[in-house]
Amino acid sequence: MLILASASQSRKKLLENCQIEFIQISSNFDETTIQEKNIFNLALELSFQKANSLSENIQNISLPEEFNYGPLEILGCDSIFEFKGEAYGKPSNKEEAFIRWKKMSGEFGFLHTGHTLIIGHFDSTSKIFKITEIIKKTVSSRVYFSKLEDWEIKSYVDTNEPLYCAGGFALEGIGGKYIEKIEGCFSNVMGLSLPWLRENLYRS
C-alpha cells in the first residue's frame, strides 16, 4: 500500500489517473531547516525528509485496516525549478511572479523533482514501522517557454495560479498554453515521474 507524503493536488491526480491505490497524508516537514545549496541535491534531500518525517510518526497516524498487512511504501517528492542556475520556488507575490515570467519568456529552465520511496512493513500491534529499503532519485526535465507579451504575463499572473506552483507555472493548468515543449519526463514537470514510480513501486 502506498502513502503519498504530500499535500500536492497535482501529484494526487497523477496517481488517481493511473488507478494506483493510495492515501494522501502531508508530512508537515519544515523545509526551511535544509540548507543544501545544490538545487539538484536539494530537491532530493527535501523529498527524503518529507517521506522520512512521515515514517517516523506513522505510529501516531490512524491508517486504514488494509495498511496493517503486507508491505507499506511512503512516497516523498519535492519539485524545484532551476532557471540559469537560480532556484525558483513558489513566487511570494504577483510582482515577483511577473518579474520571473519576464525573464523566462522565450527561454528554458529545468524542473527537478526529488523522489524518495521508503519501503517497509508496519506492525499494527507494536506500532513499529520497519524499513527494508530506501530508493531515491532526482528526475530532471527541460521546460521551454513561449515568447510572451507583457499583457499575457499579467493576465496569467492575475489568475493567481503561479503563486501556488514551483517555478511559477502549472503545466496541467492555465500555464500549460505558455509552454512550447518539454524534454524529458512529462509527468515530472507536474511533480511526480510516473515512469520512475512504475520502476520502483511494489518492489518489496
Curated annotation (Swiss-Prot):
Its EC number is 3.6.1.9. It is found in: Cytoplasm. Its cofactor is a divalent metal cation. The active site is at residue 78. The keyword Cytoplasm applies. Gene3D superfamilies: 3.90.950.10. Keywords: Cytoplasm, Hydrolase, Nucleotide metabolism. Nucleoside triphosphate pyrophosphatase. May have a dual role in cell division arrest and in preventing the incorporation of modified nucleotides into cellular nucleic acids. Belongs to the Maf family. This is Nucleoside triphosphate pyrophosphatase.
